Amino acid sequence: MSPFRASILLLAGALCSLPANAQQAGWSYSPLPGEGDRAAIGCGLESTPEIFACVAVRCEDDFSTGVHIYTSRPQSDAGRWAITVDKETRSFDAEAAAPYGARLVGDFSWVLHNLANGAVAYLEPEDGSPMPDNHIALDGSLYAINRALALCAPRNPPPVEPIGTPSV
């Protein structure tokens, strides 16, 4: 192989191995630094690195499950949100939280279940502020969410050596 071809192959391999640093349509691991496989993120069909509407399901530091809203809106993502999955809408409060814009608070089990098992989701801030395209297809969401939440599975405590009685 010529040195020119070898250098082209090395360059192509290096470019392909770079991490994704943008929000893209569909479900995948979170591209945010430090998140890795602890979070699954689903973004709107027309999402770009500059304009996006995403929802993330994350294994939190305390091994609980968190649902986060992450958008490119100039306003904060904290506030009250109407979340529609398969033509059923419910409202939820979200408080500012890192590394995404806001984390849902209260009972969000309906959101988690429907993100994993639904067909399409929409996010709408109840204050009426404009949103980027927020048609989030849920194809592949079950697989992505289950992989991320595997980190939240209960851990077995280290085995304890039995203490025998002195008379044995």
Where on the chain are the PLM-derived regions?
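Positively charged n-region of N-terminal signal peptides that target proteins for export
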Residues: 1-6
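A generic "folded-domain core" signal
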Residues: 21-168
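Bacterial N-terminal signal peptides
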Residues: 7-17
